[in-house]
Amino acid sequence: MSEKIYEYKDENNWFIGKMTGHNLISGWGVKHTTIKKIDDLLDGIAATLDWENPKGYDVSVVRYQSPLSLITFIIDMINQETQREIKVIPHAGTILLMENAKLLAVYLPEGGVSTATFFATSEQGFGDTILIATRNEGKTKEFRNLFGQLGYRVENLNDYPELPEVAETGTTFEENARLKAETISHLTGKMVLADDSGLKVDALGGLPGVWSARFSGPDATDAKNNAKLLHELAMVFEQKKRSAQFHTTLVVAAPNKDSLVVEAEWPGYIATQPKGENGFGYDPVFIVGETGRHAAELEADQKNQLSHRGQAVRKLMEVFPAWQAKQS
């Protein structure tokens, strides 16, 4: 058992933890009944682990929204300390803990869930597969990394070559994401996740915005877009005046359901020259917050913890079970 201090923080949740000789969850905003349910759930998991004594977790909650994030945080601690591969999978309003295709435990919300909802086919819920409304393999890779941690298999439109391109004629991120998700869902009868993401640069009045992918023209490439952006900011010398935000809007659409919408932003600055070999799009010229590091210098797992898309997916996972239950 290590002395490592673990931390997870976003705008809705903030947890700090370490492995100790006992199980303890304390802090703000968590009902005592919820803490007891989580402890009971994870005590069952602990009984299956081959740990050296003492064993246990000590978690302080600074900010709390839902049990999904808290359970995921504790399981991540357990996985790192024990080299296990326990997955946390939200399903039909419940939270499943699984490893090696075996169900270890189930967290039920207050009031439980109906058996019809729980055992519904994947066409009526996320199931095991998510269809992402994009042919962009870079974007798909990010979603695959994010959803893979939650036990989902990701498909994209390259798996369905017969589907038409959906024109992004909207003037906002939400309009474009809705167009893609709702059109593809109508054509396939599947649950579809679409995103519209872009870079908003304050000195350019929010541009390139919804035109981020084609900022340099109809034959735009990542390199051309980055070059145009740096050219537009050539006379802006102070970093604080080169502030920018990556923005993501996610929309989940399914037949006969109201669509679900979440948004997130990742603040930073535009560099004066590209740097880094990872990521795609504007990552080489985007400085992450006050870190001085470019997004293209981050490994995938680091980026997913911080990025606009990672934040949006975590928001989506927080609200999806309630949306699914309401729409069923």
Swiss-Prot record:
Identify the residues that bind Mg(2+): D196
Its Gene Ontology biological processes?
nucleotide metabolic process; purine nucleoside triphosphate catabolic process
Among the Pfam families in the record, one is Ham1p_like
Reaction(s) catalyzed by this protein? XTP + H2O = XMP + diphosphate + H(+); dITP + H2O = dIMP + diphosphate + H(+); ITP + H2O = IMP + diphosphate + H(+)
On the tree of life, the source organism's domain of life is Bacteria
Give the keywords, sorted.
Hydrolase, Magnesium, Metal-binding, Nucleotide metabolism, Nucleotide-binding
Write down the required cofactor(s). Mg(2+)
Q: PANTHER family attached here?
A: INOSINE TRIPHOSPHATE PYROPHOSPHATASE, INOSINE TRIPHOSPHATE PYROPHOSPHATASE/HAM1 PROTEIN
State what protein this is by name. Answer: dITP/XTP pyrophosphatase
Give the organism the record lists: Streptococcus pyogenes serotype M18 (strain MGAS8232)
